[in-house]
Amino acid sequence: MTLIRIPLFPLPLVLFPHAILPLHIFEPRYKQMIRECVDTESRFGVILAGERGIAKIGCTAEVTEITRQFDDGRMDIKVEGRSPFEIESVVEEKPYYEANVRMLEDETDAKSAAIPEGLLEVYARCHILLFGSEPEEFDRENNESLAFAIAEDLPLDVEDKQTILASRDENDRLARLLPMLNQLIPQAEVRYRMRRKAGGNGHASV
């Protein structure tokens, strides 16, 4: 498969296709990177960075809006996740990292994947406990992966999110999600009780 070179933005989070991510760009190397991406209408790669280094699989991102620019070159932007990729090699020729990557496609049709029994009910319960409302109805025609949408929406452990992003089969992703959501319920119940005790009625801080 053909390799392409893209800039890398290591972050302590996982970006999914179709997800919107606000970013504050302040480091000189990333100000340069974002400016070059905007000027050339090109994408960069968001990759999970942790104590063990960077992950092998990430998601390309496209700048959709520059919401604020500062005199010193800092900027607030919004990006949208596009496509998963796998790093083949990292290149250090510029102030920021680049990588030769191959784009990843699902091995099966995500839209036709079977939804595990109980998954939507557990998802709705988590959402109500955490945010005080039912989740929005999922549009499977415009957003291919229900698993990506759920994993993006809820405060799952970042390693769990990375596991979902790395899978190339929607049936596998959905099957993996169900125990993750069941494990989230106790945490969601604690946050719900804290919100009730504080008298809040808005979104919980996650």
Regions found by a protein language model. Give the residues of each.
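N-terminal low-complexity, acidic/polar interaction/targeting segments
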Residues: 1-206
